[in-house]
Amino acid sequence: MFNNKLFQKFCRDRNVKESTQHGYESALKNYTQYHQETLTTLIDEALAEENQAIPLKNRKLKKRLLNYRNYLLKSKSSPNTVRTYFSKVKTFYRHFEIEIPKLPDVKYNKLYETNYLDLPTKKHIRQALEIVGVDLRAIILFMSSSGTAKAETLSLTVDQFITGTQDYHDGGNIETVLNTLEHKRNVVPTFYLKRIKTDKYYYTFCSPEASREIVKYLKTRPGVKMTDPLFDFSASTLLARFQEINDGMGWGFKGNYRFFRSHTLRKFHASNIGLSAEYIDELQGRSKNMIHETYIKTNPQKLKSIYKSAMKNVMIHEENIPEVHHQEFSITINIFLSGKEYNIF
């Protein structure tokens, strides 16, 4: 598909990111395979019908789109996948200035909506950690305590971890830094990363127990470099490893998806950390409105303090939860009633 000149032009004209290209490629491959035609043939056919001034309702394009949508609806694909694939096909046609005929509305099957009780608990995550190696322990603890999505997690580099922990070491080569961090139990790294879906930069943090497991994991990778991925997984490999955990534990499905997967760790974080929606959105990289993005900048130290006050809620091993020291305040309130002053302590 990437060798098709029309597809290459489409991606180049729209400056489509590689991750988004894969989504279009999947949808368009599915569409061309269903019709057993090439992209070039399908576009040429639609252009020829326009040049011949065939009424929209009588064009092959309308029949092709309706038949393809019916095929998707009868498949085992989720409603979201059906909508996404069909939308991408129409976008491709429109890019080449082909008018889309009016299509009748269709009712999509209601997708099962997960609720709080469908999410993994700390017990589930502990059970998963007991059956995997240090590589998966590191990534599971990172994702569940930071709420970072899979794409951003796999985009992190060793350098970002070393830089993010600079308050806890005095620098040096990777081995020296890891040896220093290995003996600390309070490391909460600060990560500044980009949300791949939206290009938004944001700050997030992970727990001390995640940091310790990351250090252990990095020490098992001799010759690791600053430019190397922090977590050495491809997206497909990570997906397969989560499937192995879920199926091995017999946890089954919730709706169309397996119970234990990377995205449910993100939901675990959002649903359990106990902060307001505003702070959860900050930590997970969800966008504010454009005015806020332009004028209001996040203070990472303040956000880190807020995160640390709540991170116990997403830490998995109780013995690793640090003590939270509360400050006591003495407040005097002056009240005036009927001309008299009362002090309440």
Where in this protein do the model-derived segments appear?
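Non-catalytic DNA-binding core/recognition domains of DNA-processing enzymes
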Residues: 14-97, 206, 274
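Flexible interdomain linker/hinge and immediately adjacent N-terminus
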Residues: 48-54, 98-127
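Catalytic-site neighborhood detector that most strongly recognizes the C-terminal catalytic loop/helix
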Residues: 284-324
